[in-house]
UniProtKB/Swiss-Prot annotation:
Family per record: Belongs to the universal ribosomal protein uS5 family.
GO cellular component, one term: small ribosomal subunit
Top-rank taxon, per record: Bacteria
Identification of the protein by name: Small ribosomal subunit protein uS5
Gene Ontology biological process: translation
Coiled-coil regions, chain positions: none
Gene that specifies this protein: rpsE
Family annotation (PROSITE patterns): RIBOSOMAL_S5, S5_DSRBD
Domain S5 DRBM, first and last residues per copy: 16-79
Keywords: Ribonucleoprotein, Ribosomal protein, RNA-binding, rRNA-binding
Matching Pfam families: Ribosomal_S5, Ribosomal_S5_C
Description of how the protein assembles with itself and partners: Part of the 30S ribosomal subunit. Contacts proteins S4 and S8.
Amino acid sequence: MAKTSARSIKPGELNLKEKLVHINRTAKVVKGGKRFGFNAIIVVGDKEGHVGYGLGKANEVQDAIAKGVEDGKKNVIKVPIVKGTIPHQIIAKYGSAKVLMKPATPGTGLIAGGAVRAVLEMAGIHDVLTKSLGSSNPHNVVKAAIKGLQSMSDAYEVGERRSKSLKEVFES
């Protein structure tokens, strides 16, 4: 698997935008009643091949979103994009959430729902077919999509791993 370390990407140098995927209200029962808290899952990306996600928890919605954005900026990965789509088909699993992603021809558009759509939009992928299988929990679906994008490798990386030129990779 071709994994780009998050340490090599400096989020301060990127023009990152954020997208809110899901807000969840939690309640803690105390002696005087219920105390509410919020958690927010946020996807950040520059729409040019960099994407990350973050989880923020706080007593107020705005604070949870701000914490999620900061967390997302710490988890940015590089995604290989070939002509506006992904280099190859992949099935990624996280928990009981499974995400299938297939490359599509230019003009197809982004065929994805909810959490996967947010991840792919922020990564800058325009043409892809996806199907979310298993759990629909947005936390696990986002993590599965990120895991799938992180494990992708383009032809250059394959050639580098095999110590072959690009021409030799396509001949074998």
